[in-house]
Amino acid sequence: MVPSNGAKVLRLLSRRCLSSSLIQDLANQKLRGVCIGSYRRLNTSVGNHANVIGDYASKSGHDRKWINFGGFNTNFGSTRSFHGTGSSFMSAKDYYSVLGVSKNAQEGEIKKAYYGLAKKLHPDMNKDDPEAETKFQEVSKAYEILKDKEKRDLYDQVGHEAFEQNASGGFPNDQGFGGGGGGGFNPFDIFGSFNGDIFNMYRQDIGGQDVKVLLDLSFMEAVQGCSKTVTFQTEMACNTCGGQGVPPGTKREKCKACNGSGMTSLRRGMLSIQTTCQKCGGAGQTFSSICKSCRGARVVRGQKSVKVTIDPGVDNSDTLKVARVGGADPEGDQPGDLYVTLKVREDPVFRREGSDIHVDAVLSVTQAILGGTIQVPTLTGDVVVKVRPGTQPGHKVVLRNKGIRARKSTKFGDQYVHFNVSIPANITQRQRELLEEFSKAEQGEYEQRTATGSSQ
């Protein structure tokens, strides 16, 4: 007996499932992989028994998802396709329009738009609106796709209609079964989709929103280091309800949408997907009232102040990261991070070039000619610098290790002193007479050298 195309595929799937060490390894972590049955069981199944491929539990214990391998029957052959024709909540809209953001929106914008709409459209807040729950589900579905980078990239590539059609069949990337020869279907792509989806659950960003601020520093504050208090607006846990979203003492009620299980089921072709209940967030319970201060969002917009330590040697446009002091997470996970970008003002005396600094020193005519000593400013105070006789404009001297200490290092840069010569615009009569005598003497020496050279 020659097995059908469907049987061949099922054989590959069962072997892949039973021999895969990856799923077994994941059992020791947060993911259980249970593959039940064999080729014989799969090939002869006539019921709707579902074999669990994997399950997932989030940090909070509320967000769970099971992907179930649906029932196969003996008539499953070469003409069956993974594509489906199921309806979609948003058949006439794209996900970006649902959330009211542009296609170039950043992750933070998408998250902000979602929380705003979720708060506005939550069924508990719109008990008189029969369409509120549907709208809430639309917003949640759009956010579920756009918050995940890989799903969003796929969505942008194939477009809304193609994505919805394929998603209704359970496999965003499948090509379906072709007539007779299989049409390019690769059964391993199915397991790739399963594994990818499962791992993506772990890779999804958790925590509150990151905050970015600018901080103005003087030149010396950047060079020597300092402490600054940064104040900014961000999401903060609601004080009224303690971040719970409901008034203290509010009684819990069993969620009617999921009957207290915390999960709802979606049937997509051969797949039965159980996902977190959108109404109760997987808790299995709801509340009769919500907090009036945060309107159930658990967080409110407020002002926050954080003390930031600036290391010595920072430079203009440097960005410092202060972990977990950003926006509060409505789900109760870790706060976001604070990113402080520095704007360092220019100094009237010092010019910076990496760890080195440059200063100008102005010499009088006589100092340049005769030499001597001058005082030069440094980062730690004035020092005396020797001027060689005959110093020309533009000459420089180097003061070793008088520059800036490099960040997180014990090494210092150098200081460069650039000499300029100041020519007086006004002089006294005596100074003129002396300069004229100097000029005559200089001219005489020149003529004498010329005459001596000619006689030779």
UniProtKB/Swiss-Prot annotation:
A GO molecular function held by the record: heat shock protein binding
Knockout consequences: Defect in fusion of polar nuclei and in synergid cell death.
Sequence positions that bind Zn(2+) 1: 238, 241, 291, 294
Stored Pfam families: DnaJ (PF00226), DnaJ_C (PF01556), DnaJ_CXXCXGXG (PF00684)
Coiled-coil zones: none
Keyword match Zinc-finger: yes
Subcellular localization(s) per the UniProt record: Mitochondrion
Superkingdom assignment: Eukaryota
GO annotation, cellular component aspect: mitochondrion
Transit peptide: 1-89
Binding site for Zn(2+) 2: 255, 258, 277, 280
Keywords: Apoptosis, Chaperone, Metal-binding, Mitochondrion, Repeat, Transit peptide, Zinc, Zinc-finger
Every J domain range: 94-159
Tissue-specificity statement: Widely expressed.
Residues in CXXCXGXG motif repeats: 238-245, 255-262, 277-284, 291-298
One of the GO BP terms on file: embryo sac cellularization
SMART domains hit by this protein: DnaJ
Main location: mitochondrion
Zinc finger region(s), CR-type: 225-303
Described purpose of this protein according to its UniProt entry: Chaperone that may play a role in mitochondrial protein folding. Involved in female gametophyte development. Required for cell death of the synergid cells during fertilization process, and fusion of the polar nuclei during megagametogenesis.
Family statement: Belongs to the DnaJ family.
Protein name: Chaperone protein dnaJ GFA2, mitochondrial
Organism listed in the record: Arabidopsis thaliana (Mouse-ear cress)
Gene assigned in the entry: GFA2
